[in-house]
Amino acid sequence: MRTHHKIAVAVVVIIVMLLALLIPRTGHADQTASFGDVVIRYSAISTDQLFPAVAQTYGIERSNRNGLVNIAVEKKGGTDASEMIAAVVTGKVADLTGHSRPIRFRETNEAGAVDYLGEFPIDSSGTYVFTINVSKIGQTTPYTVKFNRDYVAD
């Protein structure tokens, strides 16, 4: 009887641990901003978090001193790559002292899913402030997304 109880407890512990793996981490998960019928998805990470194969595919150096911003623009309510919207993406990153640098974005297209990737240096540990401007093709006034991320540079 006692052995069955230990096995049952072990199974419950394993199930709880596996379920915990399914819960998304919110620290650097994609975030969204809505502008009418447009949704902008954005995230920023240090490139050392990329899988080596992904970094190699996109020619990105993996390092805790390099950051990567990923932007996707889609039609609100879109469910697949056909709902992606072509855009012009520009932006800048600043530290809390106000030192600012432009971020150059490049378009990637994989199976119809369009993303805009921009790399930036992480000079020191701290909070970085991002200002991203997104314009649909033919649009003169951009949508602006602002967000912060904390980075640790060794």
Can you say where each PLM-predicted feature lies in the sequence?
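Extended low-complexity, serine/threonine- and proline-enriched intrinsically disordered segments
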Residues: 86-95
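Aromatic sugar-binding surface patches on proteins
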Residues: 110-117
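Short, aromatic- and glycine-rich surface loops/edge beta-strands on solvent-exposed regions
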Residues: 128-135
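Beta-strand-rich domain onsets/edges
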Residues: 29-68, 151
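Short beta-strand edge segments in extracellular beta-sheet folds
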Residues: 148-154
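Short acidic/polar inter-strand loop motif in beta-rich domains
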Residues: 136-143
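Beta-strand-rich structural segments
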Residues: 67-77
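Bacterial N-terminal signal peptides
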Residues: 10-24
